[in-house]
Regions:
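Gly/Ala-rich phosphate-binding loop of Rossmann-like dinucleotide-binding domains
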Residues: 24, 28, 164-166
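Short, flexible hinge/linker loops that cap or flank conserved catalytic cores
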Residues: 3-6, 29, 88
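Glycine-rich FAD pyrophosphate-binding loop
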Residues: 28-48
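Beta1/beta-strand and adjacent pyrophosphate-binding region of the FAD-binding site
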Residues: 3-19, 36
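Dinucleotide-binding Rossmann-like beta1-alpha1 core, especially the glycine-rich loop
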Residues: 53-131
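Helical element adjacent to the flavin cofactor pocket in flavoenzyme catalytic cores
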Residues: 144-168
Length: 168
């Protein structure tokens, strides 16, 4: 054992990326304080360091959409809670369909995501062009807009989750 690492803990989490940090954060929020996060190098040194940090709320299933919506709300509040910068902001997102099959899939997504409380709507091609002036719209079938989709710094958000876990 390395010096300073306890020989036991109620919960041991292997991996100090955003997933491990989130597990630690949520366990401590539920009253489990004896949590140990192990990382082979430094926190966020693996996959998290390379992640894009996109926070999209429209997912393939109701459960995943609900989880993604929870995550977006958490990221929105985390910086204030922990006084740790996360880089979270909400520029919104656009999804486009180039064929009828994809457009039907997106319309089902609009219906499903609306039941979870995601602000989501279909947009016309002229509005799409306002958002994205260089887009070629004549071969598109449809588009949707989610104004509260965001982006975060995965490294900073991980550190905020760790700080939140330490604070309990």
């Amino acid at each position: 054992m390395s010096k300073g690492i306890p020989d036991r803990a109620q919960v041991v989490i292997v991996g100090g990326g955003i997933i491990g940090a989130s597990v630690a954060y949520h366990l401590t929020k539920r009253g489990i304080s004896d949590v140990l996060v192990l990382e082979q190098g430094q926190l966020t040194g693996g996959t998290t360091w390379h992640a894009a940090g996109l926070v999209s709320q429209l997912k393939s299933t109701y459960s995943l959409t609900k989880l993604a919506t929870y995550s977006a709300r958490l990221f929105e509040e985390l910086e204030t809670e922990t006084d740790q910068a996360t880089g979270y902001r909400t520029p919104g997102s656009i999804s486009v369909a180039a064929d009828r099959e994809r457009w039907e899939e997106l319309k089902r997504g609009i219906s499903m995501a609306s039941t979870v409380g995601v602000e989501i709507r279909e947009i016309e091609m002229d509005e799409l062009s306002e958002f994205w002036p260089l887009v070629k719209t004549d071969d598109l079938v449809g588009a949707l807009y989610i104004p509260d989709d965001g982006v975060t710094s995965p490294v900073d958000t991980t550190m905020a989750l760790i700080k939140g876990a330490r604070n309990g």
